[in-house]
């Protein structure tokens, strides 16, 4: 995994043609929160900023990937839980949530925000649910690379970049689903029960 040390936050413009693709990316970035630092950084636009004590509600989905450190997450549908490096958090539109790093460890996080009928359909069919927003997929250089690809295409903003980066988001979602389904059978208790 690349050790990027400068935070990068991108908030993207979306055209009517982009919307017709069925999924669009609204924001992408990464930030590194050292131990003892305030969270979140105050460089986000108002609709994305929040205080961990009060949380927030977004109008889009977001995939937050914690690659270093630990912290806490809670939402309207999920009680407070400890999260560690290797956890992917799926935030849902219209769902109150809060998350923050442990002050002793800080954390490194990548995120991508998105919306559209492709993800709405996957949620409707219960591939992803508000009750289970935490996906403990482990650390993956491949997934970090996908986030970095989104960042690269988003910073270049060439024609068709929205279609490219939103398709990468679908790849990440597929990877999360696959990893979680296959990780569940590494639990010896589950394997013993099946046998």
Label the model's feature ranges.
Residues 77-92:
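Short acidic-glycine-tyrosine-enriched beta hairpin
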Residues 80, 94-118:
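Ligand-binding loop in jelly-roll beta-barrel domains
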């Amino acid at each position: 995994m690349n050790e990027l040390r400068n935070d990068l936050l991108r908030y993207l413009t979306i055209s009517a043609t982009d919307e017709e693709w069925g999924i669009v990316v609204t924001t992408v970035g990464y930030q590194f929160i050292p131990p003892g630092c305030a969270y979140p950084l105050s460089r986000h636009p108002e609709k994305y900023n929040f205080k961990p004590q009060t949380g927030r509600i977004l109008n889009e989905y977001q995939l937050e990937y914690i690659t270093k450190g630990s912290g806490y997450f809670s939402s309207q549908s999920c009680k407070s839980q400890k999260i560690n490096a290797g956890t992917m958090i799926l935030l849902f539109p219209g769902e109150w949530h809060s998350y923050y790093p442990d002050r002793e460890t800080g954390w490194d996080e990548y995120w991508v925000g998105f919306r559209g009928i492709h993800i709405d359909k996957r949620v409707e069919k219960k591939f992803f649910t508000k009750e289970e927003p935490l996906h403990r997929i482990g650390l993956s250089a491949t997934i970090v690379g996908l986030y970095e690809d989104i960042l690269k295409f988003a910073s270049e903003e060439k024609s068709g970049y929205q279609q490219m980066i939103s398709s990468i988001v679908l790849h990440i979602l597929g990877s999360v689903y696959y990893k979680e389904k296959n990780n569940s059978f590494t639990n010896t208790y589950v394997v013993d029960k099946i046998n």
